[in-house]
Curated annotation (Swiss-Prot):
Domain of life of the native organism: Eukaryota
Name of the protein in its database record: Uncharacterized protein txt-18
Length: 260
């Protein structure tokens, strides 16, 4: 009789304990920490809902509401956080399964051991991954082709620009030569007019350069100016050219004044 009463008291206490406050659901954990049946149920809620597959898509209001509903359906094992826990759990599952498929789907790979138990449940993702992989390859090929076209187009103006710069440099050098030639011609003319002595400028000697082209007659000047400008930084090149022109013009004016 006493044993029977003890059993009744024990049963009553056990029943009260079970009827108390339910145990609190633990915070978010990796999918391998939950029961397999719970994760299988969680995965089944995504089957056929391609708009939720890729975690890379923008987090729109529609996706947030969808994850919230899924999280609510899995509330018996997943802590409620306005859909964020459901989205995070799916992110782990999707990424691990994607890595496994990209690596050849080897179930014996040590890195894939966590996702292997859920391989059969996640097979509905394979057509989606194959489709997105084909699209990404097509996009990459198109982008590379466009980049090549842009590079070819960019090279043409560059070559034309270089040619125009060379022409400008040639024109500038020719102007220097013409200025120096004109300066020397003016000087010789003024000397002939103001002196009874025969001009040395027109005197012909065995080494005379009167019949040589302008560029050859002033080769030493050209070489000196060119070598000097090669050492000038690009940002100061135009300034030096302007100063050189100013110097030549001042010398021309000075010689004209002296010849009067």
């Amino acid at each position: 009789m006493e044993k029977f009463i003890d059993l009744l008291e024990f049963g009553s206490a056990e029943q009260k304990r079970k009827m108390g406050r339910p145990s609190k659901i633990p915070p978010f954990s990796h999918y391998d920490a939950y029961r397999r049946s719970d994760i299988d149920f969680f995965i089944s809620l995504f089957s056929g809902r391609e708009e939720l597959y890729s975690p890379c898509k923008k987090n729109s209001d529609f996706r947030q509401k969808a994850f919230y509903i899924i999280e609510k359906k899995c509330g018996h094992f997943l802590a409620m956080r306005k859909g964020r826990n459901a989205e995070k759990l799916w992110l782990y599952l999707f990424n691990d399964f994607e890595k496994m498929i990209r690596n050849g789907g080897d179930k014996n790979d040590e890195k894939s051991k966590s996702i292997v138990p859920f391989y059969d449940c996640l097979q509905f993702l394979i057509p989606y991954l194959e489709k997105t992989d084909s699209l990404s390859k097509l996009t990459l090929t198109t982008c590379n082709a466009e980049a090549d076209d842009q590079q070819v187009k960019a090279k043409k103006p560059k070559i034309e620009h270089e040619l125009s710069e060379d022409k400008l440099n040639d024109d500038w050098l020719q102007k220097v030569i013409d200025t120096v030639t004109c300066q020397q011609s003016t000087s010789c003319t003024s000397i002939q007019l103001n002196s009874s002595a025969p001009s040395t400028c027109s005197a012909k000697t065995p080494n005379s350069t009167a019949n040589l082209p302008t560029s050859e007659k002033h080769a030493d000047i050209i070489a000196y100016v060119t070598n000097f400008l090669e050492d000038v930084p690009n940002d100061k090149l135009m300034l030096h050219k302007v100063r050189l022109f100013q110097f030549i013009e001042e010398e021309k004016s000075r010689l004209k004044e002296e010849s009067k």
